[in-house]
Amino acid sequence: MEHKEVVLLLLLFLKSGQGEPLDDYVNAQGASLFSVTKKQLGAGSREECAAKCEEDKEFTCRAFQYHSKEQQCVIMAENKKSSIIIRMRDVVLFEK
C-alpha cells in the first residue's frame, strides 16, 4: 500500500470513531430542569446546543435543554441528580 492510501485509511478510521454529538446524552421529551447555574443561547438545532454545552468554559455543563419552537438552548451545570425536573411542552432535556 502506498503512503497516501495508508494516510487516507487512517483519517477515515479516525473520523468514523467520533460519533454523533448527542450520543453522549440521555434525553427526556417534555422535561425541564430547574437550574441556578445556566446560560440561555440561541441554537438552530439540538446538535448545535450540544456543541455549545461541550465548548462552555465558565462551568462544567452537565445538561442542556432545547426549546425547538424558540430555537433556544439552555446549558446547565446541574442535572437531575442535583436539581428538580418539571414537565414542560416543546422542550427536550439532554443529560450526560
Curated annotation (Swiss-Prot):
Keyword annotations for this protein, in alphabetical order, are:
Disulfide bond, Secreted, Signal
Q: According to the UniProt entry, where is the signal peptide?
A: 1-19
Cellular localization per UniProt: Secreted
Does Secreted count among this protein's keywords?
Answer: yes
Q: Which GO terms describe its cellular component?
A: extracellular region
Q: Does the keyword Transmembrane helix apply?
A: no
Q: Which Gene3D superfamilies match?
A: Hepatocyte Growth Factor
Got any disulfides in this one, which pairs? 49-73, 53-61
Q: In which tissues is it expressed?
A: Expressed in liver.
Coiled-coil zones: none
Q: Which residues form the PAN domain?
A: 20-96
Q: Which InterPro entries match?
A: Pan_app, Plasminogen-rel
Summarize the protein's role: May bind non-covalently to lysine binding sites present in the kringle structures of plasminogen. This may interfere with the binding of fibrin or alpha-2-antiplasmin to plasminogen and may result in the localization of activity at sites necessary for extracellular matrix destruction.
Could you tell me what this protein is called?
A: Plasminogen-like protein A
Q: Which gene encodes it?
A: PLGLA
